[in-house]
Each structure stands twice: as structure tokens, then as C-alpha cells.
Amino acid sequence: MISVEKIDDKTFNVTVNKSGTTQHKVTVPDDYHQKLTKGQISKKELIKRSFEFLLEREPNTSILRSFDLPVISQYFPEYERTIGV
């Protein structure tokens, strides 16, 4: 289960309950949100989909505890192609 809680316009707390519970702090720059979604989905939904993407590739215990969303593409080059609308 993935739970996303908004802290402010760019920062979110994410709780993942799979193989134990982990907490993550994720920052989503406005321009990156626009680039990936063209404004068609919310930042919360983008983060949820991004964590689903990550969980298909690694356990929640391996996901960084705090990161900017663009960092995902440094580890998984296919991320932007896969997640974008």
C-alpha cells in the first residue's frame, strides 16, 4: 500500500507498507511535474505512480528515504518514458 501526504506544494511524505513499512520524503519540482504529466495528473498521483514503478524494480527498503523525483531517472533511465502521459 502506498500513502501520499502533502506537506507543501512541492514536498510530500510517502508511506509504503510492503515487506515492512518505510517512510520517504519526496520533492517534486513544478517544471518536472509539468514535463512528465503536462498537468494532466496531480503531483500526488504522479508520486503514487512513481512508487509503483519503483516497487516493480526494487523493494521498498531499497528506495531512498529522501529524494527529488528527477533522481529516479538517474537510476532507471526508462522512468520518464514509462511514467509520462
Predicted feature locations:
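Short, charged/polar N-terminal "headpieces" of proteins
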Residues: M1-Q23
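Short amphipathic alpha-helical surface micro-motifs
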Residues: E5-K10, K35-L36, E45-L46
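Long, contiguous binding/interaction regions
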Residues: G20-Q23, T27, S73
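A short, polar/proline- and glycine-enriched secondary-structure boundary/capping micro-motif
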Residues: H24, L36-T37, S50
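Helix N-cap / beta->alpha transition motif
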Residues: T27-P29, D68
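Short, surface-exposed linear segments at secondary-structure transitions and domain or protein termini
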Residues: D31-Q40
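Acidic, low-complexity intrinsically disordered segments
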Residues: Q40-V85
